[in-house]
């Protein structure tokens, strides 16, 4: 079983190489016309499987299409990776949409709304105290 340092090092190498493949080797208009970033790679302890989380500036429906296209192209990506890096076995890949940024923004929006509500309530209380 590989140690965490080795898994992190291999994940970093996979991220770098897959990014290069996405930028230079894939001939897909949907993928080329949208900014795609690999945010995280989760590699299994036995190095056989990896989940590749992507972020994009595109809308949710387009991001789903991007993930579908990437999953259709994963055989090509895996084959190209095998030619570029020395690994006993290139891991099976699954591409997923990383929604962490979206969730973080919605939490920030909720916090801002709560802050505004509290500010409005405090203003009403001050206004009522002045009338007394």
From Swiss-Prot:
Its main location: cytoplasm. SUPFAM superfamilies: Ribosome-binding factor A, RbfA. It is found in: Cytoplasm. GO terms for cellular component: cytosol. The keyword Cytoplasm applies. PROSITE patterns: RBFA. The keyword Ribonucleoprotein does not apply. One of its GO terms (molecular function) is ribosomal small subunit binding. It holds the Pfam family RBFA. InterPro entries: KH_dom-like_a/b, RbfA, RbfA_dom_sf, Ribosome-bd_factorA_CS. Keywords: Cytoplasm, Ribosome biogenesis. GO terms for biological process: maturation of SSU-rRNA. One of several proteins that assist in the late maturation steps of the functional core of the 30S ribosomal subunit. Associates with free 30S ribosomal subunits (but not with 30S subunits that are part of 70S ribosomes or polysomes). Required for efficient processing of 16S rRNA. May interact with the 5'-terminal helix region of 16S rRNA. HAMAP family: RbfA. Monomer. Binds 30S ribosomal subunits, but not 50S ribosomal subunits or 70S ribosomes. Belongs to the RbfA family. This is Ribosome-binding factor A. It comes from Prochlorococcus marinus subsp. pastoris (strain CCMP1986 / NIES-2087 / MED4).
């Amino acid at each position: 079983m590989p140690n965490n340092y080795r898994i992190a090092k291999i994940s970093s190498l996979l991220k770098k190489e897959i990014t290069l493949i996405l930028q230079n080797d894939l001939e897909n208009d949907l993928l080329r016309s949208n900014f795609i970033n690999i945010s995280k790679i989760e590699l299994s302890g036995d190095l056989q499987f990896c989940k590749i989380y992507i972020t994009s500036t595109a809308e949710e429906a387009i991001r789903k299409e991007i993930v579908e296209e990437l999953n259709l192209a994963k055989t090509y990506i895996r084959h190209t990776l095998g030619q570029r890096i020395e690994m006993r076995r290139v891991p099976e890949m699954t591409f997923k949409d990383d929604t962490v940024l979206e969730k973080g923004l919605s939490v920030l929006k909720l916090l801002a709304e709560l802050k505004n509500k509290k500010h409005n309530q405090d203003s009403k209380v001050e206004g009522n105290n002045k009338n007394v």
